[in-house]
A protein has these predicted regions:
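A well-structured
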Residues: 1-169
Length: 169
């Protein structure tokens, strides 16, 4: 949770002080990183609430992410007479041979489909956790924090989503 306070403190630095920091060649390399952190400033909560959210993430968001990671790591993918790990089968998705790419994609799809209930539950819970957190922060939409993290405007994501929806079968 101490990393939370690092971001909070960066957001407390005055613009005047930041100009001095950016003027220093050794510190200027952090300019974009600092600017990205400061984009969250309007949505920052008080210190106690930020600490609560951070500590709560251990049993909410982090737990779901860990369950996903552990599940993916434990899956076995039958491919060419062997049971491969996720890392091994995913390598075949970019294999030189088209037949290997196609077969590995089919295997991955089949194994993931067998676990669709669990992955759906994980995805829905993660979406709900983010939605609640973003609502508390006053972000304009449920994916606002993701867009800020990825340094992309909501309108760009909306336009991309619309284009995909219009052009998908």
């Amino acid at each position: 949770s101490s990393i939370v306070f690092f971001s909070l403190e960066i957001n407390e630095i005055s613009e005047k002080s930041l100009k001095k920091i950016y003027a220093d060649k050794k510190l200027n390399i952090y300019k974009n990183w600092i600017k990205n952190i400061r984009k969250f400033k309007p949505y920052q909560l008080d210190v106690k609430t930020e600490k609560l959210l951070q500590e709560k993430s251990i049993t909410s968001r982090s737990a779901w992410v860990r369950l996903f990671d552990d599940t993916i790591a434990s899956l076995k993918f039958p491919f060419k007479g062997k049971n491969l790990s996720s890392a091994e089968i995913f390598n075949f998705l970019s294999d030189k041979k088209e037949s290997n790419r196609k077969k590995s994609a089919e295997v991955v799809s089949a194994v993931l489909k067998d676990n669709i209930s669990l992955f759906t539950s994980i995805t829905n819970n993660l979406a709900q956790v983010n939605s609640i957190k973003d609502k508390w922060r006053g972000l304009p939409n449920p994916v606002g924090s993701r867009n800020l993290s990825h340094v992309v405007e909501d309108e760009v994501v909306d336009a991309l989503t619309e284009t995909i929806n219009v052009n998908s079968p």
